[in-house]
Regions:
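Phosphate-ester processing/binding pockets and catalytic centers
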Residues: 1-296
Length: 296
């Protein structure tokens, strides 16, 4: 058995999101097909169709967009039949050259939040773990920065936590990433390779993490879409760690922050602090306020 870490990123375009977040969801390979089957069944029962048939997907930026929260609460909860019919009317409106009516918007909003809730519940069901590296948006590199071909400090901490998890379970791990802009992906792959092959810490972690990531398109992979949901929710609504002071979307925080806390990897580890051993909590979601290395 091995563990697959499905990864995505949020905020690296430096536009509307408050932080830069990279990370994802780890799940045992033996549970992968089971959770995918459950996702497909849930999608059809909640929306009444496959979203891919209408060229859309359940990424976090879509399921949890502000408008869908607004639509969902504008009327009482719908029963399953009414919701599915409303969703279909909503999705086919542009094909039929008509405007959706109020109840169609309500149905689509309620279905979106119900799907997000269901996906998080499935992560609990299959004992998935969340790992994420958070850093300030738009941090500038120091002048004459020498380590652009190596991982940033926040990404090193992400690898450290995934490696600890794998070592604890005595299993190896694969990274499967959402394919984005080609040059951006090539750079991150090069940084990973240098980290795992040229640094002592990376070489040690390569005993557990396969150093070569795989890139796939999110619109054809359910698990990368779930990773996107988790990373988006962390960026917009997770403020549990010291230093996370940027504006928060309260509707996401109130609905999912405790869920994200519970799903993140956690380990009690012994570290040498000021010359003495001390037990510390290691969490899968980690904020780094200064991500650029000063030395290798």
């Amino acid at each position: 058995m091995s563990y697959l870490l499905f990864m995505d990123e949020s905020g690296h375009d430096h536009k509307s999101m408050p932080y830069e977040v990279r990370g994802g969801v780890s799940i045992a390979s033996v549970n992968l097909f089971k959770i995918i089957q459950d996702i497909q069944k849930s999608e059809e029962s909640i929306f009444g169709c496959r979203l891919s048939d209408f060229k859309t997907e359940f990424k976090g930026s879509k399921l949890l967009e502000k408008e869908r929260f607004k639509w969902a609460k504008q009327d009482d909860p719908m029963d399953d039949d009414a919701r599915c019919k409303g969703v279909r009317r909503f999705l086919t409106a542009h094909l039929e050259k008509r405007n959706p009516i109020r109840s169609d918007f309500t149905a689509y909003g309620q279905a979106s939040l119900k799907m997000a809730d269901t996906l998080f519940n499935l992560l609990f069901k299959y004992n998935a773990k969340i790992f994420a590296a958070i850093s300030p948006k738009g941090m500038q590199k120091p002048q004459a920065y020498e380590f652009d071909d190596y991982l940033r400090r926040d990404h090193i901490r992400l690898m450290e936590r995934f490696a600890l998890f794998l070592e604890e379970n005595r299993e190896d791990g694969l990274m499967i990433m959402d394919q984005s802009e080609r040059n951006f992906d090539k750079k991150f792959k090069r940084q990973l390779s240098n980290y795992f092959l040229k640094t002592r810490t990376g070489q040690k972690q390569a005993q557990w993490i396969v150093p070569e990531p795989f890139f796939i398109e999110s619109d054809i992979n359910y698990m990368v879409q779930i990773a996107d949901l988790c990373i988006y929710a962390i960026n917009a609504g997770f403020r549990c760690e010291k230093g996370l002071n940027e504006p928060v979307r309260t509707e996401i925080q109130e609905r999912y922050e405790k869920t994200l806390q519970a799903l993140q990897y956690r380990k009690i580890d012994t570290r040498i602090i000021k010359g003495a051993p001390k037990q510390v909590n290691i969490y899968g979601i980690k904020y780094t306020n200064s991500p650029y290395l000063s030395k290798k």
